[in-house]
Amino acid sequence: FEAEAKALTAKAQELMTRHAVDAAALHAGDDTDSELAPVAIRIPIDAPYTDAKSLLLQTVALASRCRSVHDPDLDLSTVVGFPDDVAVVEVLFTSLLVQAQTALTDAARHAPPGTRTRSQSYRSAFLLSYTHRIGDRLEEINQHVIDQATIDHGGSFLPVLRSRSDRVEDHMRAMFTTMTSKPVRGGYDRAGWASGQLAADRAAINLADLEQADPTTTGSPRPVKELT
């Protein structure tokens, strides 16, 4: 099902990006887009592996024209962006995290005796590899849509997208006047890294998932089963 999963994810991500591009093209050359303002929501990041999970959220947010800031003291991440984009981030992150956790559970269930699929280093490496590969896939899809839209619209939408990106960045910095960055640390496990990449290639987001991305209900994250 790997090829089918890739096709579903590509189609869904293309739909999301095309929607943003079409909206930007609609506002190209006028000032109506400047009346729209970014919003912010908080999404709980449950232990364990909060660093890896928050990095997955950050990766999804960036691919969806949003920004994410993690507060390790509260185990919360704040996502900043325009309402439609933020709603999609919530749904996309939840679905991808559930699929990662399902893959980890299956790996532990079917592993031969003595395999370290339940070790912290294996699971941390799995989630980091999964996030890295998901980021690559989303970036590839986005670039394809932007390239095609540039042919269709002649690039008129690009200044609007840049303006929106700047406003999201300004809104985030106004909310968080002091921010620091740090590397996500996790034990390296070759098997965990390979399994994470495979799970990311198999991960699917279909159009039915996106129907849940209602900006009027954004901010009520769906529960996600914790890893143990």
Describe every region a protein language model picked out:
Residues 21-228:
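Extended, helix-rich structural scaffolds rather than catalytic motifs
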Residues 5-19, 127-134:
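Short amphipathic alpha-helical coiled-coil/interface segments
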